[in-house]
Amino acid sequence: MSILSENNPTPTSITDPNESSHLHNPELNSGTRVASGPGPGPEVESTPLAPPTEVMNTTSANTSSLSLGSPMHEKIKQFDQDEVDTGETNDRTIDSGSGDIDDSQQSHNNNNNESNPESSEADDEKTQGMPPRMPGTFNVKGLHQGDDSDNEKQYTELTKSINKRTSKDSYSLGTLESPGTLNALETNNVSPAVIEEEQHTSSLEDLSLSLQHQNENARLSAPRSAPPQVPTSKTSSFHDMSSVISSSTSVHKIPSNPTSTRGSHLSSYKSTLDPGKPAQAAAPPPPEIDIDNLLTKSELDSETDTLSSATNSPNLLRNDTLQGIPTRDDENIDDSPRQLSQNTSATSRNTSGTSTSTVVKNSRSGTSKSTSTSTAHNQTAAITPIIPSHNKFHQQVINTNATNSSSSLEPLGVGINSNSSPKSGKKRKSGSKVRGVFSSMFGKNKSTSSSSSSNSGSNSHSQEVNIKISTPFNAKHLAHVGIDDNGSYTGLPIEWERLLSASGITKKEQQQHPQAVMDIVAFYQDTSENPDDAAFKKFHFDNNKSSSSGWSNENTPPATPGGSNSGSGSGGGGAPSSPHRTPPSSIIEKNNVEQKVITPSQSMPTKTESKQSENQHPHEDNATQYTPRTPTSHVQEGQFIPSRPAPKPPSTPLSSMSVSHKTPSSQSLPRSDSQSDIRSSTPKSHQDVSPSKIKIRSISSKSLKSMRSRKSGDKFTHIAPAPPPPSLPSIPKSKSHSASLSSQLRPATNGSTTAPIPASAAFGGENNALPKQRINEFKAHRAPPPPPSAPPAPPVPPAPPANLLSEQTSEIPQQRTAPSQALADVTAPTNIYEIQQTKYQEAQQKLREKKARELEEIQRLREKNERQNRQQETGQNNADTASGGSNIAPPVPVPNKKPPSGSGGGRDAKQAALIAQKKREEKKRKNLQIIAKLKTICNPGDPNELYVDLVKIGQGASGGVFLAHDVRDKSNIVAIKQMNLEQQPKKELIINEILVMKGSSHPNIVNFIDSYLLKGDLWVIMEYMEGGSLTDIVTHSVMTEGQIGVVCRETLKGLKFLHSKGVIHRDIKSDNILLNMDGNIKITDFGFCAQINEINSKRITMVGTPYWMAPEIVSRKEYGPKVDVWSLGIMIIEMLEGEPPYLNETPLRALYLIATNGTPKLKDPESLSYDIRKFLAWCLQVDFNKRADADELLHDNFITECDDVSSLSPLVKIARLKKMSESD
């Protein structure tokens, strides 16, 4: 019997004395023919490579007990038919049950000694190929005795042993030797054939080609091999040999016939596909694979594989008889530790799945178990899955792998073969690893994974599913603020820019403390009434930088001639000279794009101007905040949605009229103001400015985008010229700004413009025309007559716009510290979003009101018709229809026109409406929940029955403060704080504050008596402190250090109590420290108490101002009870100097100074004692870790040496007298 050595070109032969096996298949030997004869050396003949013929035929003489499907049996049949064994070597049989590596090694060593003559002769044939040799060493001693039943029994045992070791011996690159061969190599008992095999790898390509041909022939001839006899070793055909060769990755210990001595000779040979020693064998390049041939044969392969699985062929791997015999594919057997130490296990795991359906083909007619087992498509455990027909390519690749040298094709075979053998769970494990590699190589294709195997497909699918990452939930990140190399902000929300400019925070200060600025602005926004409303406004483009620079450039006249030239009646002839302002809002860009569609002359200015007017009005509103420019923006706010529809005609004439030589600064601020004013008052200078802007808009889409804010202002001004001047006060409506800030920033402006409602009304009146105009612009470009008439009216009052322009220009430099500042630049467009949102809301409300009015008119018409019908008694139906038609006619055009007019902003308007509606519903639901909770906390009675003689002594932001007598004790005077829940900004805090006060009974905390919920008003009954607040004393008298110490001591006592209960007041200031006539001090206002003192109007208007807040609160950091200690320190400065630090600064700038300046500086520290300065420094430590707590401060010398409470009584009386005199 002859076996091919994979890398060794020299042939070796073994003769079986009991059988005459002939190698009729010289082609197996890479161009050499080996005939083993009785002599010690083999004959070597050079023959051309050719596929074997009739390799599947079996003879009747085949009586080997190996016919039960072992690969050895198949190979023996093949060689018996092909070539006669001329020689006979020692017949050595090995105990089949042992299967140990030691036994196989012993057998291998003996065989090596016997085949020395052949090996020595093989040395002379180094350049020759070698016939394929049987893979691995097999222990078949136990098979030489016993009858057929014994043979069957032995076979089953051997099968178990093979299955047991299948996972341990899975082949890998350079480790394809059987365990016996590996052991022999370890002991340096390597035959010359093996040495030559390691040295000569050049013949592998020829060998792989020949093996491939043999494989193909074997497949084709598979259906022809049929005799269902129990085959013997004599009848084993090349079919078996090819299967063993093809399953290079799954070489088995093959049991031989107990009476046959061939097994002993086979045990000393290695598979031709065996690369040799792992350390020395170099894998040759993979041979080329004929894909076409493989594909053409894939159908046959799949059929034969399926057939073999369908037959009753027993699988050697299905029982545990051969578990004792290790195979290369078995990685999980622990019987051969030396083999695992050979690095075979690591590589075998990667390649164990490559030997798949192999070359062995099942004869379709085979019925006998023995025959079918020999042709089972997979000869190794869990190596060959039954691959469906769609798996053709992988199957072919696998077969090619099997026929070619394992080392050369291992890269291709990785993960190709799926382990679908039902018995090999362990094998599947390694196979899945290989499949994972394959799928990763090919991009985890679903098709690839599915084709590799069902398991691999499921694995790959699961991997794909696991890779998916969910999107963020409830994400509210609206903008990322960064700082560029120049220290300017990038991505700063528009309203933030406006707030910074309005608050007087210079660009230099922003660059010095950029993070602090972002923190304080964020904090300021969080404390605004409706912080969520500002979310819509925070989206803008990075081109705001350019726009901001452009806005800053507005202070200078436009460089492009378009500004001066633009100003024609149509307003569309200007050149795109001033595109430096890019609209910050994406909405604006959309509008501009839509506007671009409009004709450049009329339609573009109108549409773009309407949309740009929206944008510009925001910019202008920013300026107006600094200046009286707000009226225009307010008009636009109310009109914003309708103006988007189509105020083209009004904007076009007005813009042309208003277009003027106005400088960019005047343009930017006055754009809204001047444009609105121009349209409302249309002074020539203002008109010139707005027309230039309008021309720029019409010049080009880009210029329009840049100028959209300008144009929008102009258009809107033209649309509703009359209301613009009064509309200035409407700016506070923008929820992004606090009422106090807006009022402080533009007190004069408020005076000049206080009628945003009329502007909106005018706008609403024009809304109907605007949609029509817009439609006409797209189609006929005809300007509606009503808008033109409206524009002329605005020009009549030119003086106000001129004043506004002058005021704006003068104020612009002040509030915008540097025209070049990016912040200032961005500031101008900042208002766009706010204005847009407010305009959306106002416009929607106006539209609803208009619809309601229309419905009322329709109703009146119907009633009138009905009355007429009653009088006539006939034609009622006609009258009804007429009334219905008349009614329908007016409303239909209005809604229809509105959508077209808002083609650019209609979608935005709808979205804003939906958002507003959702917010209203959410707010309503939340309010209901809060009210329900309050009902459970509050007393259900009527406070009017318990407390009488109510006298109002103060007014807070959400209600009044009253004094009353308790009916049960006339001498007991109580303070009642009445709050309208609808006006309370943070209703949810009321519940917590009531609960805190109920559980806080302390001499230094105002006692909470009761609370009532009456008709939507919350009544909080508290102890009355007749002395008033500490603010009265601070403002009307000068306090000594001893008196200041008393106030601090009593306040610290109350704070210590609150802090011990885990309550942080967070609003310690003089307004919340109350005194009685005896000088006793108590803390009040736990979040819902209104300010009683109306003397200092600034304090009242600055609800929620952070002058007493600790830096950690302003910087939005974590804070604890020590924030109250900082506030106490600020209150000490208030008692010393009469007001807290930064009181004259805007709230936002005060926040900035608190966050950046650290401990505030005293005006005259030298006049103070060491104790108070030390105490004050301890209270005002910026690092709260170094700041003292209430208990520590109570032990300070300044507190222990202070005056008595009675020392405050004179101050309280003086304050009351002065207050009474002031009231008189």
From Swiss-Prot:
It catalyses: L-seryl-[protein] + ATP = O-phospho-L-seryl-[protein] + ADP + H(+); L-threonyl-[protein] + ATP = O-phospho-L-threonyl-[protein] + ADP + H(+). Residues 564-575 have a biased composition (Gly residues). Residues 783-801 have a biased composition (Pro residues). The active site is at residue 1067. Residues 947-1199 form the Protein kinase domain. Residues 144-155, 608-622, 861-870 have a biased composition (Basic and acidic residues). Keywords: ATP-binding, Cytoplasm, Kinase, Nucleotide-binding, Nucleus, Serine/threonine-protein kinase, Transferase. The keyword Signal does not apply. MAP4K component of the MAPK pathway required for the mating pheromone response, and the regulation of cell polarity and cell cycle. Phosphorylates histone H2B to form H2BS10ph. Required for hyphal formation and virulence. Belongs to the protein kinase superfamily. STE Ser/Thr protein kinase family. STE20 subfamily. This is Serine/threonine-protein kinase CST20.
